[in-house]
């Protein structure tokens, strides 16, 4: 075979290794413990905008370690992180791959504003310090009331591409886009943020919802949307809900696309420039 060589240059792969070490050192210095969550589990998420990869007879490759990390927190684990693979069906392109590296961490006692500062601190360590701007979702796409969700998603994606150069935190998402974030006191927006750097979406964080009944209701809404879109039905993760009923402590969490950050550090144009091999 002639295509045995890695996709990325050896220099990019060495740089990637250095960035992985720096990220781990940053979190260790703040007493955030590294955990390892299985990549394959019986259940996955119900979120209609994210599709899981099924492994027949075994379950699903995990789109994120979120549910199992929150189970650890409910069991008494202190602030923790995972830096490892995540998987999503149907994602392929310059900025997407079915398998990618995700850095996800949870901070006990934090809200989303405190976590935004920590995300900025980490990015400054890896990418060099620069100023950040804060915009609301409405600043980015305009009024959302009465607009179809698919139209809003397209408008948001296009608007993010235009946020360049620079670093932008986007906050105050509409309540119906809360995912698993809590709702702000205004009742109209969610305690959720996204980080966009030079037009690329990098991280997505929440002040975490704690109420098990509200989670179940949101999962029910997800299932209804899945049915309307003709998507596969996804069973609710009852072990996750049981952990919430036991009690998830006050916390905020964020998921960061590590490959994209490596891309930005190395001046690369595509994920294939900073990953050794592509599995599919």
What does each model-identified segment do?
Residues 20, 24, 116-123, 216:
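Hydrophobic face of alpha-helices
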Residues 24-25, 69, 138:
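Short glycine-/small-residue-rich flexible loop motifs, especially phosphate/cofactor-binding loops
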Residues 1-51, 256:
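TRNA-binding/sensing appendages of the translation machinery
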Residues 32-35, 78-83, 129-130:
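Short secondary-structure capping/junction motifs at helix and strand boundaries
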Residues 95-146:
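A conserved active-site cap/scaffold subdomain adjacent to cofactor or substrate pockets
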Residues 18, 110-113, 210:
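A generic structural signal for alpha-helix starts
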Residues 38-72, 81-108, 143-280:
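A translation/RNA-centric and nucleic-acid-associated enzymatic feature enriched
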């Amino acid at each position: 075979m002639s295509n045995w060589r890695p996709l990325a240059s050896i220099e990019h792969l060495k740089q990637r290794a250095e960035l992985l070490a720096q990220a781990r050192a940053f979190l260790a210095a703040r007493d955030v413990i590294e955990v390892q969550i299985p990549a394959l589990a019986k259940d996955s998420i119900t979120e209609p905008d994210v599709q899981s990869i099924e492994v027949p007879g075994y379950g699903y490759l995990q789109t994120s370690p979120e549910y199992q990390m929150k189970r650890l927190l409910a069991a008494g684990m202190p602030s923790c992180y995972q830096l490892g693979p995540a998987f999503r069906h149907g994602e392929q392109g310059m900025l997407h791959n079915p398998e990618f590296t995700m850095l996800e961490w949870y901070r006990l006692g934090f809200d989303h504003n405190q976590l935004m500062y920590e995300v900025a601190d980490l990015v400054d360590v890896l990418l060099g310090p620069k100023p950040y701007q804060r915009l609301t979702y409405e600043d980015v796409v305009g009024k959302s009331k009465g607009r179809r969700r698919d139209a809003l998603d397209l408008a948001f994606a296009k608007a993010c591409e235009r946020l360049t150069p620079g670093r932008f935190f986007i906050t105050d998402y509409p309540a119906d886009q809360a995912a698993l974030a809590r709702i702000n006191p205004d009742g109209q927006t969610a305690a959720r943020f996204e980080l966009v750097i030079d037009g690329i979406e990098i991280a997505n964080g929440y002040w975490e919802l704690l109420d098990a009944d509200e989670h179940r209701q949101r999962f029910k809404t997800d299932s209804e949307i899945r049915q309307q879109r003709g998507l596969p039905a996804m069973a609710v993760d009852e072990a996750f809900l049981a952990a919430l009923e036991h009690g998830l402590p006050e916390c905020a969490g964020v998921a960061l696309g590590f490959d994209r950050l490596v891309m930005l550090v190395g001046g690369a144009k595509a994920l294939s420039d900073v990953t050794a091999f592509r599995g599919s």
